[in-house]
Amino acid sequence: MKYISVILTAIFLSTSASGALTVSRDYETEILGNWICKDLWPGYSAFEMIRYKKDGTWNSFGEVIVDFELEEDNYLKVRYGAVGTGIWEIQDDNLISMIDYVKVTNRNHSWLDEYFNMQDQFSLNDKTSEEIVVLSDNYINLKPNTGKGYECYKVKL
């Protein structure tokens, strides 16, 4: 009988301890606010200020810098300004978002728009999923299902 009570106590303590280690995340609340994000690739940089709001919408503005190769080892650095709005939600530790409006403006080589329109690179009304790799009070690391991850830092305005 003594052994049974020891085993039952061990099982009880084991389940209590494992329950205490389980962290319940409220991503919907933690993600609210203003974030500065950066996404860097060779020949591509994006910087964005995005605000996630309680009503499930977001708005953002930022800059995209792209190095277009004109000929071998000769690149043209093109700067684009962008503003956008959309909706967001959390599903299974993933940030699901959709762009419903975007405006992209070529800031320094507008003649290039005749050959390449950056605005066409953004899909409207298509949901995208990004895995929330890390989310803390002031930092988030997201990994899109289509590529490498990027990071954002929370800012107070």
Describe each PLM feature range.
Residues 3-13:
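Sec-dependent N-terminal signal peptides
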Residues 17-85, 96-157:
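Lipid interaction determinants
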